[in-house]
Amino acid sequence: GLSFFRKNYDMLKNKKLAILCVGASPFENQAFNEVKARNLKEDLKNIPTFYGRGTWDEEKMSFKDRTLCKLLQKAIANKDPKTYEPWMKALMDAMGKKCDWTDKKYLKPLLEYIGN
């Protein structure tokens, strides 16, 4: 993950690097850029970054992640659904279900980058 890049950046900086982020939320450019700005500082901010939707399976989540998601769902449930951001809607729609949003199309930009 990112900790590997941080620890080994000097050794990797002359290589062709890429970061693939995976999440349950549908892609939203503003949110993606905010996450990148928060997590990719200094040298890492210049590494090409890609996004693909993954899966949602509460049974496979750690206790900590499952608890945090449930707390977040409870907080969002108090809002008017008309005001939900895309990630909020996705989170609420997934509640109590197993979801799989994986699609090979998410890999296309990454594979094109690697191929160049």
Where is each model-derived feature located?
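FMN-binding flavodoxin-like domain, especially the glycine-rich phosphate-binding loop
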Residues: G1-N116
